[in-house]
Design a protein with these regions (language model features):
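C-terminal beta-strand of the catalytic ATP-binding
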Residues: 85, 174-177
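Conserved SAM/SAH cofactor-binding pocket of Class I
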Residues: 1-93
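Structural signal for short hydrophobic segments within the conserved structured cores
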Residues: 51-53, 105, 159
């Protein structure tokens, strides 16, 4: 069972659903337009083991039930997220192809870029199964701070993953049992 937060167009959630056709994926996003697009993309690509919901982080799951095990608690083996992580003051300086075409909601991570990240990492343990993994995309230079958030929230085996430009771009960790 997987969950993709801040799912945007659904590319990560759809990829997870395709990789595990006998599993199930939930995805959430605050943007109604993003949710609509993710649902359209999922239908177009045949990702029928995916439920896309509108709302803030984990809130859309309040009434969700485990889709594979009747009566089982809704705890995820994997949670992924690509939250807004750009500091508010840096948005004006972004390249125009990002600044002018991406919704501000998808970019603005607050004063230091980590506003939503703090809440996401702190809340994730309540939604993960024991030994579950959290993996989040981060902005350039944010990985050490996010690693500390993971440690404070009780994650172990914390790893920083670099992108093709060798920038630490993803932080992952395993929920300590």
């Amino acid at each position: 069972l997987a969950l993709d937060l801040c799912a945007g167009t659904g590319c990560v959630a759809i990829s997870l659903a395709a990789a595990r056709p006998t599993g199930f994926v939930f995805a959430t996003d605050l943007s109604r337009d993003a949710v609509t697009l993710a649902r359209e993309n999922a239908a177009r690509l045949g990702a029928y083991n995916l439920s896309v919901r509108e709302g803030d982080l984990f809130a859309p799951l309040a009434d969700a039930r485990h889709p594979l095990e009747l009566g089982a608690p809704l705890r995820f083996d994997l949670i992924t997220a690509n939250p807004p992580y750009i500091a508010t003051g840096e948005i004006a300086g972004l390249m125009s192809d990002v600044r002018d075409f991406e919704p501000r909601l998808a970019l603005d991570g607050g004063a230091d870029g980590l506003e939503l990240m703090r809440r996401l990492v702190a809340e994730a343990p309540k939604h993960l199964a024991p030994g579950g993994v959290l993996a989040v995309e981060v902005g350039a230079g944010e990985a050490p701070d996010v690693r500390a958030l993971f440690a404070d929230a009780g994650f172990g085996d914390i790893e920083l993953h670099r992108d093709y430009a060798r920038i630490e771009r993803v932080v992952s960790g395993v929920l300590s049992t």
